């Protein structure tokens, strides 16, 4: 399925909006720090590496999504600390 750049940007914007909303409404998300996220990020990175070594395209896509979620979450957490 092919999407235009505009559609991709809108989808990514919705993704970031959801992260922002979760940081406000979800107690678990709200208490996360860079330090507390690190073990999960390491696990997701290993899962991505495993999928890459197996050349499992479906799993690679899934794990890339998980890693992207972590990167965006770190950005959200760090931005909060920069603006305080």
Walk through the language-model features, giving the residues of each.
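Extended low-complexity intrinsically disordered regions
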Residues: 1-60
């Amino acid at each position: 399925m092919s999407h235009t750049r505009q559609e991709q940007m809108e989808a990514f914007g919705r993704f970031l909006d959801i992260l922002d909303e979760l940081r406000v409404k979800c107690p678990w998300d709200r208490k996360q720090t860079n330090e507390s996220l690190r073990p999960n990020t390491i696990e997701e990175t290993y899962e991505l590496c495993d999928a890459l070594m197996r050349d499992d395209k479906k799993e690679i896509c899934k794990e890339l999504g998980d890693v992207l979620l972590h990167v965006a979450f770190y950005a959200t957490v760090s931005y909060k600390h920069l603006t305080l």
